[in-house]
Amino acid sequence: FRGYLYTDLLKRYKEVIIYDEDLDNIKKDMPVSSEADGWNFVYNDLKYAGEHLPVDKTPNGRLTSGAAYAMLSRAMLYAERWDDARIAAEKVMGMGYELEAKEDYSNAFKAGSKEAILQYCYDKSSTVTHDFDGYMVPGGDKALDGNSMTGGFGTPTQEMVESYEYA
């Protein structure tokens, strides 16, 4: 989503140049927009996506209305627009997403989980690969073939490891 990327820009820079037309027509002298205008742009962009994307999560991994409204809610928290964040969150909560039962905790990580609002799904039989697992190994560990430089970003702390029961 364009609104998702602009959320990241606004979090970092507060003021951004808003490109809302065909990239072939971009002018080099575009003015910097105010932070308020930037958040209005994000709001309108993600609200439009929420209104026009399908609610149904099948096929797995497809962007949905729920994903757009979840992103909108989070963006409006950063913008300190509390009512807009609440309204978007209520839309997501009304779409059938649920937390997985404690007894079925592992289901939260499976494709099609009722807990997943936006989920990457991979098929072992396809040729589509990823290096996400490289983020979960200690830095410098050669978990992947080639020159992956991803190690360590998602490595859990010892405190987190100890919070789980041992098998």
Name each region found by the language model.
Residues 39, 43, 47-50, 62-167:
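An aromatic- and glycine-enriched ligand-binding surface/loop that stacks and positions planar moieties
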Residues 1-63, 79-84, 88, 94-95:
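Aromatic-anchored glycine-rich loop motif in surface-exposed flexible loops
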